[in-house]
């Protein structure tokens, strides 16, 4: 198992990824509202909204919550006006981090992000310095006991997936953004349950951290960023050194 996968496994076990159901619903509702405002409330003609609603259903978000979020976006209900922001950051050990944000007040969020970074040895990067190290990809993660490796390869690659990784009892399916919806639909049609399913920034290469204290700072920094209410997602090129033993 690679260090990047080792880190992902630790995060799943700790429940660090959107651990609270309320946090999941809040983040998805923001995405739905922004998508509806940008492209209208008709899912058929608005791919971004369609993907957000699919994600909401996968998270078992109540139908009323979904409809309310759409109405807020289209102006049918009063709601916050959100601004999309992307923060490019550095963490200790030369690790690069991308932070996706939807905020109703950037003047509040930016100092909060800076504070989280500064307290754990991180900093904001210049525009483009970090984003060039990542690619935008669809990523679907599912437990390997649901389907054989051969069957998944046939199904996912046939639907347009680019790559499939097998790590620690999990499959990670990667797609281009344009093929993400088709691949997700193909997997769902076979009754497969996704642990995670989203379009996110994937690192082209990783930075291995072999010093325990530095690794712990990076992990804490990422967790603190994810805990911020305005943060939609965090991606990094962090790779935990194979010899690093955490408490």
Curated annotation (Swiss-Prot):
Predominant location: cytoplasm
Organism: Leptospira biflexa serovar Patoc (strain Patoc 1 / ATCC 23582 / Paris)
Cellular component aspect of the GO annotation: cytosol
Localisation: Cytoplasm
Molecular function terms, GO-annotated: DNA binding
Keyword Cytoplasm: yes
Protein name (Swiss-Prot/TrEMBL): Probable transcriptional regulatory protein LEPBI_I0056
BP GO annotations: regulation of DNA-templated transcription
Keyword line: Cytoplasm, DNA-binding, Transcription, Transcription regulation
Database matches in InterPro entries: Integrase-like_N, TACO1_YebC-like_2nd/3rd_dom, TACO1_YebC_N, Transcrip_reg_TACO1-like, Transcrip_reg_TACO1-like_dom3, YebC-like
Pfam family, one: TACO1_YebC_N
Similarity comment: family membership: Belongs to the TACO1 family.
């Amino acid at each position: 198992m690679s260090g990047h996968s080792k880190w992902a496994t630790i995060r799943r076990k700790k429940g660090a990824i959107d651990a609270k159901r309320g946090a999941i619903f809040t983040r998805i509702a923001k995405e739905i509202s922004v998508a509806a405002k940008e492209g209208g409330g008709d899912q058929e003609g608005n791919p971004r909204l369609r993907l957000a609603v699919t994600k909401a259903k996968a998270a078992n978000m109540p139908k009323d919550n979904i409809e309310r979020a759409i109405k807020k976006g289209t102006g049918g209900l009063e709601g916050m006006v959100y601004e999309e922001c992307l923060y490019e950051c550095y963490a200790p050990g030369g690790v690069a981090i991308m932070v996706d944000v939807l905020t109703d007040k950037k003047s509040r969020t930016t100092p909060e992000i800076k504070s989280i970074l500064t307290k754990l040895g991180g900093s904001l990067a210049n525009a483009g310095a970090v984003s060039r190290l990542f690619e935008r990809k669809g990523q679907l993660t599912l437990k390997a006991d649901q389907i054989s490796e051969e069957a998944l390869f046939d199904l996912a690659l046939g639907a347009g997936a680019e790559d499939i990784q097998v790590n620690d009892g999990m499959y990670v399916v990667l797609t281009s953004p344009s093929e993400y919806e088709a691949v997700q639909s193909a997997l769902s049609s076979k009754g497969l349950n996704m642990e995670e399913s989203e379009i996110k920034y994937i690192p082209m290469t990783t930075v291995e951290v072999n010093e325990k204290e530095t690794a712990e700072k990076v992990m804490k920094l990422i967790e603190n960023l994810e805990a911020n209410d305005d943060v939609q997602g965090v991606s990094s090129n962090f790779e935990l050194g194979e010899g690093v033993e955490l408490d």
